[in-house]
């Protein structure tokens, strides 16, 4: 899994799935319904990610943290962190062997946005999307 920078304010879901699928951001965006609109407006939900991955034959399932419990988060898992002062809309990150792939590690700077790896999640996990 390689670094993929999100190319729009709400494009973290696209960047994480692109990295997981070894596709470019633009290639992956085509697998999201209304991706070019949602990346600029309200972003994506778990079902959008699951459907996009399904479109490229990757099976996934979403869990809330209450249901997930203390289970270990495996490589290739996408996590949504809850809204916070820093991430006012929440944020998706991808678990990799290099740590958490953050598609906008230099938030809030958008010009240019940069992706990077970090050792810990920058917030509290709210949702987990696991590859089946």
Q: What residues fall within each predicted segment?
A:
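Conserved active-site-adjacent core of cysteine acyl-enzyme catalytic domains
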Residues: 32-124, 130-131
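Short intrinsically disordered terminal tails
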Residues: 1, 131-132
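Active-site-adjacent structural segments surrounding the nucleophilic cysteine of cysteine proteases
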Residues: 1-38
């Amino acid at each position: 899994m390689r670094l993929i920078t999100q190319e729009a304010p709400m494009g973290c879901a696209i960047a994480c799935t692109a990295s997981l699928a070894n596709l470019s951001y633009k290639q992956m965006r085509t697998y999201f319904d209304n991706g070019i609109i949602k990346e600029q407006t309200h972003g994506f939900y778990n079902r959008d990610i699951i459907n996009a991955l399904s479109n490229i034959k990757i099976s996934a399932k979403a869990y809330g943290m209450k249901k997930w419990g203390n289970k270990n988060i495996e490589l290739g898992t996408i996590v949504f962190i809850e809204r916070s002062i820093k991430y006012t809309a929440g944020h998706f990150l991808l678990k990799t062997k290099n740590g958490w792939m953050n598609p906008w590690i230099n938030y809030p700077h958008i010009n240019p946005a940069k992706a990077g790896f970090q050792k810990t999640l920058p917030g509290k996990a709210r949702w987990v999307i696991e590859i089946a």
